[in-house]
Amino acid sequence: GRGANVTLPFKEAAFSLADERSPRAEAAGAANTLCFVEGRIIADNTDGAGLVDDIQQRLGVSLQGLRVTVLGAGGAARGLMLPLAQAGVARLVVANRTQPRAQALAADIDPHLEAQELPVRVEAVALADAPAADVLINATSAGLHGDGPTLPARLFEGCQLAYDCIYADRPTPFMQQAMAAGVSRVSDGLGMLVGQAAESFRL
């Protein structure tokens, strides 16, 4: 075959196996796609591209000039940073329960944004201090088991889209909170899954 898709918990291992890594994989520190080219293994990460494509194409929300807050500072959040910056967001905030983890992510990601000559930098805040945003993205695993952090209502003020990276057969707790707060557009991450697969296939 010409390549392979990789999922949790093997994304970091796939990244370390590769002979070459795309800027997206380097920024994410993980790979979900391996391409085999002339005996070499090339790692890429299409998760963020899948999210951006889902938001802009399927949901019709242009990210250019918008304020985006990402909840969570784990591997899922890390893979979103470079593609969101490349989409032209005006502000990119990472909010985590513990601020030092968000700060560590920002410190890791900012050199990649500089290398791509992107003007935006990652702002790291504690979840309790997260600012309102045009687009709110939940990249935490909370909600996978029907639970989820109770978020301050002010977080949803002026929000155009609340997007949960996980997908389920019913609205996630994050989506339910957003709807209760009056956010008109909410989505789970099924389209992101489809989008990252389409991007992998294109590679």
Locations of the language-model features?
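Phosphate/diphosphate ligand-binding glycine-rich loop within oxidoreductases
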Residues: G1-G60
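Short glycine-rich, flexible loops that bind phosphorylated cofactors or substrates
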Residues: K11-A13, L144-G146, R170-P171
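Rossmann-fold NAD(P)-binding glycine/threonine-rich loop
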Residues: T33-F36, D47-A49, L151, Q160-L203
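Glycine-rich adenosine-cofactor-binding loop
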Residues: N45-G48, I55, L59, Q64-V89, ...
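Mobile, glycine- and charge-enriched loop segments
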Residues: V52-V70, P131-V135, A153-A162
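NAD(P)-binding Rossmann-fold cofactor-contacting core
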Residues: A87-L113
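Rossmann-like NAD(P)-binding element
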Residues: T98, A128-T150, Y163
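Short acidic low-complexity segments
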Residues: E114-A133
